[in-house]
Amino acid sequence: YAEGFQLLSQTGGTLAQPENIGYFTESKHYKLAEPPGYKVVYNLLQLAPTANNQYLLGFSSANRFVGKFYLSADTVKVVMDIENLEMAAGATWQLEDFFMEQGNNRNNLLNNFATVIEKNHPRLKIPFPRGWSSWAAFGPHVTAKNIYNNLAEIKKKFPTLKYVQIDDGYQANMGDWLTVGKSFDGGIKEVLLKIKEEGFEPGIWVAPFICDTNSTIYKEHKDWLVKDSVGNPLRSDKVGFGGWRLAPWYVLDGTNPGVQKHFEQLFATMRKEWKCSYFKLDANYWGAIHGATYYRKGATRTEAYRDGMKAIVKGAGKGAYILGCNQPMWPSLGLITGARTSMDIDVDFESMQHTGLENLYRCWQNNKLWWNDPDCLLLSGKLPENQYLFHASLLYATGGALLSGDDITSLPANRLAILKKMVKAQGVTAEFDSDKFNYGWINNHSKKQLVVLNWGKDAKTFHIPIKKPCTLINYFTGEKIGSFDKEIVLKDFAGQDGCVYDVQ
């Protein structure tokens, strides 16, 4: 297994035959260069010649440079990308720290790696986040009525869903985040203040590092944008992916003092005047775009991104929940409180499985580097009940932020019952038996739980070893499953099903 530079890229398989886990790879989608004959991965590389002989190699800091691995069938090259910077005679550069450890337990290796990273990049801490987001249910066409109706249901039935977050669509242009468009009849501030008045924390979607050509930022502040090799504003589609809407995007330069001041003022305004304490930052990858030149001479793309993020963190203020989405993974260390760990999820079982796998490979990061955000819990639609339980159980196992993404007013009683159990999650991650992710244990002080996932279509029997006798209770229904002495045997566990059990 190996990480990507940005959120949407992960790699599995073998050295000879690497397999893309994420849909959007660095080489094809973002057009990051690969030397002939090698697969390039980033940040973390896990090798398992046998189950009891495993290696973890990784970069445990990300202050200036990007760490890479070049892979072929018989070679692993450890690479530090210095971005063609010229090193003056007599100068010294501090490279990034490197970690390597061998062992027989995958979870222990990952936990040790996380501990070293956290020493280099202390995390921004907030309590376990629970909330609701408008995007999955309503997209960019969300209305004030949609928000108010769900707010009323949340207040009545799910008051622990503290954050109520409005997503993309409110802004006039990409880049002009305080100039609202036609949505909410131009009154998004009033909606946010209403959320606060009802006792909840307003959240907002922002893509701070990008702008489109219709924006005031682009028209009046071209000096704020990163430049190409001849000094013109860099069109992102000339070096990589140009953006998913209103493209091509241009990129704000995090090393520019004007941009830093703009970021600080923007987020301070949203915190103090709009009362937002939850900031969903999207398109963060562009803040570390390759092929750019910066205001500060000699700056790397990691430094440009981190300089910008430091200004955002300062403006957002103490206790803010800062969620990174479409983010460069390691450059975000210590500068976000939450990290998206998968592609967007849909009410579709293939999507639930695929994003679930992406999330489970990153479980080790949760509550160590940041709070993982496995995307929304989705319980609407017409899927079979077992598939919703697979999805809910998997999200519960990640220990990541719990964000409902449905129009809660339209959920049937059986789905509301699942949501009522999910909001009680405590942010504790399951440790799985292997990277097959068939079953995992959650140890939350004196409370122990077991998560079981059947990824296949057919029913199967699970044999799970235990160290002492126990009784299993279905967490979602309260039903007693049985008592077990030496191993837990779950017969005919339905295909594409999942469950969380209380272990007594």
Task: Describe the function of each predicted region.
Residues 90, 132, 164, 195, ...:
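Conserved, mostly hydrophobic/aromatic
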Residues 39-41, 395-398, 403, 433-468, ...:
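Carbohydrate-binding surface patches
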Residues 1-162:
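Carbohydrate-recognition beta-sandwich/jelly-roll modules
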Residues 392-435:
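Aromatic- and carboxylate-lined catalytic core of secreted/periplasmic carbohydrate-active enzymes
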Residues 219-261, 265, 303-410:
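Glycan-recognition surfaces
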